[in-house]
Amino acid sequence: MDRTETRFRKRGQITGKITTSRQLHPQNEQSPQRSTSGYPLQEVVDDEVLGPSAPGVDPSPPCRSLGWKRKKEWSDESEEEPEKELAPEPEETWVVETLCGLKMKLKQQRVSPILPEHHKDFNSQLAPGVDPSPPHRSFCWKRKREWWDESEESLEEEPRKVLAPEPEEIWVAEMLCGLKMKLKRRRVLLVLPEHHEAFNRLLEDPVIKRFLAWDKDLRVSDKYLLAMVIVYFSRAGLPSWQYQRIHFFLALYLANDMEEDDEDSKQNIFHFLYGKTRSRIPLLRKRWFQLGRSMNPRARKNRSRIPLLRKRRFQLGRSMNPRARKYRSRIPLVRKRRFQLRRCMNPRARKNRSQIVLFQKLRFQFFCSMSGRAWVSPEELEEIQAYDPEHWVWARDRAHLS
């Protein structure tokens, strides 16, 4: 208790001294002295009334920290300062680009944050002698325009190359259902007038004239088959002056092969060109054998057993007839005599057979030149006939014969 009493007494003496000093020097409050550092000295007066307190508790009031004061002063100064205008951030808007039926297509477009005030500030900072007026067109746009003009001039200077037209596919509106359209793919017909001229030129050939007069029943050369000849001329890709008589018969044979199921109608072309000879029999047998193999997948397997069957049959016949070996030696001679006899009766058989083989080879080459596109739609045939409907060829209709 003695320590606390002495502490309170000392504190009372200090406060008494401070109060007396304030009474003796009243003018110091009005004009406080400055310190040597240049900052004013602040006097702290404690007018607290002393009283008893709990033992062990500091009676001095808690003072505010220096950091809190500085924070408050900074906040006051920041409130006093005028608020600076912040630049508007770029915004995103949606604008209508196209109108599709009852639906709208929106395109995202960024709004430019540049205001007229920014242009004025920029013009005020320019040096004297500089045009402050804003440019109407950007430099990038000018460069792009100049590059476009140069590219157009270069394209005009270069010679245009004439390329052969290629078949294209377009979509045309077939029917309109409410707000929906049904599209149908249609191939563009690339038959040029020069192909019609080549066809008309070949019709003046005497052999082709005789062939058309020979086909009275129109089994090989009706108007649709002749229209397919013009289409094949356009697809083959040859110049019009290169088409000869053989190309006409190749295209006509290929048209009959695509449209007619009768094999005799195609053989009539060979009958007219090379005559009725027996040289086509091996070719027909070969075709018949190929057709049989395509219809029966086991034909190749069964064919491998043919030599064994012939051997067994020969062994059986030899066992039954001991003179079979003697007669067998005469078989090549008989075949040779028979071939010589047939050749004497028709000396043109060997020559005609080679010509037919050459015709088939040329037909295959002509088919490959068209890239295998031998099918022709009825619409294309109608367009071919509509080019010159008064032509005498289109009167060759089978319906008029019956």
UniProtKB/Swiss-Prot annotation:
Transmembrane segments: none
Region (Disordered) residue spans: 1-90
GO MF annotations in UniProt: protein kinase binding
Biased composition (Acidic residues): 76-90
Feature: compositional bias, Polar residues: 16-39
InterPro entries, alphabetized: Speedy (IPR020984)
Family: Belongs to the Speedy/Ringo family.
Protein name as it appears in the record: Speedy protein E21
